[in-house]
From Swiss-Prot:
It comes from Photobacterium profundum (strain SS9). One of its GO terms (cellular component) is proton-transporting ATP synthase complex. This is ATP synthase subunit delta 1. It is a peripheral membrane protein. GO terms for molecular function: proton-transporting ATP synthase activity, rotational mechanism. F-type ATPases have 2 components, F(1) - the catalytic core - and F(0) - the membrane proton channel. F(1) has five subunits: alpha(3), beta(3), gamma(1), delta(1), epsilon(1). F(0) has three main subunits: a(1), b(2) and c(10-14). The alpha and beta chains form an alternating ring which encloses part of the gamma chain. F(1) is attached to F(0) by a central stalk formed by the gamma and epsilon chains, while a peripheral stalk is formed by the delta and b chains. The gene is atpH1. Keywords: ATP synthesis, Cell inner membrane, Cell membrane, CF(1), Hydrogen ion transport, Ion transport, Membrane, Transport. InterPro entries: ATP_synth_OSCP/delta_N_sf, ATPase_OSCP/d_CS, ATPase_OSCP/dsu. F(1)F(0) ATP synthase produces ATP from ADP in the presence of a proton or sodium gradient. F-type ATPases consist of two structural domains, F(1) containing the extramembraneous catalytic core and F(0) containing the membrane proton channel, linked together by a central stalk and a peripheral stalk. During catalysis, ATP synthesis in the catalytic domain of F(1) is coupled via a rotary mechanism of the central stalk subunits to proton translocation. This protein is part of the stalk that links CF(0) to CF(1). It either transmits conformational changes from CF(0) to CF(1) or is implicated in proton conduction. Belongs to the ATPase delta chain family. Its main location: membrane. SUPFAM superfamilies: N-terminal domain of the delta subunit of the F1F0-ATP synthase.
Length: 177
């Protein structure tokens, strides 16, 4: 476990528990994702390293986020600023989304194919993954022509490489050993 995850987890867990208690999981996911993107911005990174006070940093981020953050989201950022942890917002967002997915029994799967897949193929992949993982699957699809043909699927710790490039690489490794 990385130090960032260790530091981010209590903030994410507190936000998650609050969101569940108030039936606001989707809203909190959106808020934290937006705040994460703001904090990742290069100009904002410069501001965070500038030495401003916690109050000033909170004021700046809240003004940039504008109406994307409710009062409780603003309070979370204020607490993080007071503890010098605003740079951890992306890690908190990631951890929150992990907790949300666990709670909702969902998982995101990256499907990389050599060509654009048809809807029927995506439905079949989704159904097979849902059976195998016993979770609802959200597919993130992309095309990588260097695969030559086939597909690579990544869902959590599961990696299925059924691409021609992957098969050629495995064959090459076998022949070289």
């Amino acid at each position: 476990m990385s130090d960032m995850t260790t530091i981010a987890r209590p903030y994410a867990k507190a936000a998650f528990d609050f969101a569940v208690e108030n039936g606001e999981l989707a809203q909190w996911a959106e808020m934290l994702t937006f705040a994460s993107e703001v904090v990742k911005n290069e100009a904002m990174q410069d501001i965070l390293r500038s030495g401003f006070s916690a109050d000033k940093l909170t004021e700046i981020i809240v003004s940039v986020c504008d109406e994307q953050l409710n009062e409780f989201g603003q309070n979370l950022l204020k607490v993080m600023a007071e503890n010098g942890r605003l740079t951890m917002v992306p890690a908190v967002s990631d951890e929150f989304l992990f907790l949300k997915n666990e709670h909702e029994k969902t998982i995101e799967a990256d499907v990389i194919s050599a060509v654009v897949l048809e809807d029927s193929q995506l439905v079949a992949i989704s159904q097979k993954l849902e059976q195998r993982l016993e979770r609802k699957v959200k597919l993130n699809c992309s095309v990588d022509e260097t695969l030559i043909a086939g597909v690579v699927i990544r869902a959590g710790d599961l990696v299925i490489d059924n691409s021609v490039r992957g098969k050629l690489n495995r064959l090459s490794d076998t022949l070289q050993s």
